[in-house]
Structure formats: structure tokens, C-alpha cells
Amino acid sequence: MKLLTAPWIRRATAANVFAIAAAVFAADKIVEISINQPKDLFPESITSLKDGTIILGSVPGGIYKIKPGETEAKMFIAREGNGFTTVLGVLADEKAKTLWVCNTGPGELKAFDLTTGKAKGSYAMPTGAVCNDIAVADNGTAYASDTAGAKLFMLKKGATALVEAAADPLLAGVDGLAFGDKNTLYVNSVTANKLIKLDLGPDGKSTKVTDLKLSGPLGAPDGMRAIGKHKFLEAENGNAARAGGRLTLVTVDPKTNTATIQTLKDGMQATPATTATKGMAWVVEGKQDYRTGKNKGQDPTPFKLYAVKIP
């Protein structure tokens, strides 16, 4: 057998290092994830961490995590023992090391340790409320939408109970929410296909509610995630007004109260949620029609997530 020379070993080592680096690079460029287990995942909301981790909220209850470079959804916070009934919203607050969760039936805003998944608190909404999604202000105040009550509630840092932050007929069907700046909160209506601007006062409560003018129609808008000043991603489920799941980039001019809607990806099944990490916008198909709709009883898998580079 021929002995390996030092130069050959150096070349082989360099080749291996290159191969490993290429594999990591490839893993970081995953643009589609297909999840086959669990079959009752039915994701309704997604959030993410700066390192590329994606966290999914499952409607039947439970929180799942997909680590960077992986495609498998692993249980992070179990349904059992955590008071989950129906999970509609999840939001990672890395600054506060908190995962916020909207549970409904009853409506509650829940807080968990973002690293360990340990419960930190649970904050009840009024009877009949539907806690749907969450946004967090720069000062740490968490806002949660009540879709059934046409209201927003807030939980200030250190507070022990939710406080009503906004109530208005324009908020009927309120669902997703995202900050435009520290004094401006944008929300949508999943039932009325609207985008709405809320001006916030020093106490964090709404002082003015404005129906925005849209550059095009929306189709059951759902999850929203801020990605810049007066700029956010939005996921749409689709309806008679605009069919099919769609991911959009929305830019608002707060002076003219107009919203410019740019399609990033469409032609999907109903997409209830989006998130942004590492320059990519992720959107997920919820497949709720396989749970309670026309396809109930059929195999819903795979549950798919798609990534699009943010312009």
C-alpha cells in the first residue's frame, strides 16, 4: 500500500473542510420544507429566531421547532400540562427570552421561556374572546388580537393582567398585527379584507383607528410580521375576492394612509402565517380544510413551508 504524503493529506483535509462548508451553506439555503409527521400538525402560526430556527404553533395544541438546516418538526412545548386547547398565534421575543402564544377556548395570552419551553405566565382575555396573534413593542409591551371581540389587548412589561388597548368597529375580524414604528401598530381583518392603522398614545392605548387605502385586494389576510419601518410581510388564506394562498410585502405610507402590496409568492394552498429570518420570508400552508373542512378525514400531509428572499 502506498503511504500518504503530507501534501496529499493537506489537500484531502482541505477538500473535506470545503465539503463540510458546502453542506452547511446548502442547509442554510433550504427554500422548501415538507413535514409528514405529526399528521395532526395543522400549523396556524409561525415565528423564528435570528439563527434561522422556525417555531410552529399547532391548532390542536402544542408548539414545534425546526432547527437551522433541518427539515423535521420536533416537539418543543407539549399540549399536555400547558393548558393548550387551540393554538392560533406564536411570537418569539428574543430580547425578553419569551415565546408568546395565543390560545383560545378560552382566550389566553401565554408566555414560555424561549430556550427551555417552561411556562412563565398565562393571562386571560374576557369570556368569548379569540386570542389570535401577537406583536411586541420596543418597550416590551405585548399586544394580542381578539378576533371575536374586535379588540386588542396589551400586557405591559411586569404586568399581571391584560388591559384593553383598542376597541373599534373597524377591528371586526382583527387577526394579524405588526408595528410600523414605536407609535404605530398595523392590523388586518381576516373577515373584511382590510388593513388598519392604529396610532398609539403614551399609555400604549389606541388614540386613532384608520382604514388604509390598498393598492389591490386582499384574500382573508392573516399573519403579519414587521421587517422594517412601516413595512411588513403578510400571509393570506385566499377567498372569493382573491383565491389561493399568497405571501406579500406591504409598505405603508403613514402620511397618505396608503398600503402598497407586492406579491412575493402565490399559487399555494391557504397560508395563514409568515415569518422572517436570515433575509428570507417563510410562509406555511395550514391545511385546515383537512381538519374541519371539505377534505376532513383525508391525509393532510405534507405540511409545506416555503421561503422567498426578501427584496
What are these regions (language model features)?
Residues 58-59, 104, 147-148, 190, ...:
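Short loop/turn segments immediately following the C-termini of beta-strands
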Residues 30-37, 72-81, 118-124, 161-168, ...:
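A short beta-strand motif characteristic of beta-propeller blades
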Residues 56-74:
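Beta-propeller domains
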Residues 273, 279-311:
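Blade-level signature of beta-propeller repeat domains, shared across WD40, Kelch, NHL, RCC1
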Residues 108, 153, 194-196, 242-248, ...:
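Structural motif
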Residues 2-14:
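Bacterial N-terminal signal peptides that target proteins for export
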Residues 38-54, 81-99, 125-143, 148, ...:
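Beta-rich, blade/repeat-based domains predominating
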Residues 67-71, 113-118, 156-160, 199-204, ...:
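Short loop/turn segments that connect beta-strands within beta-propeller blades
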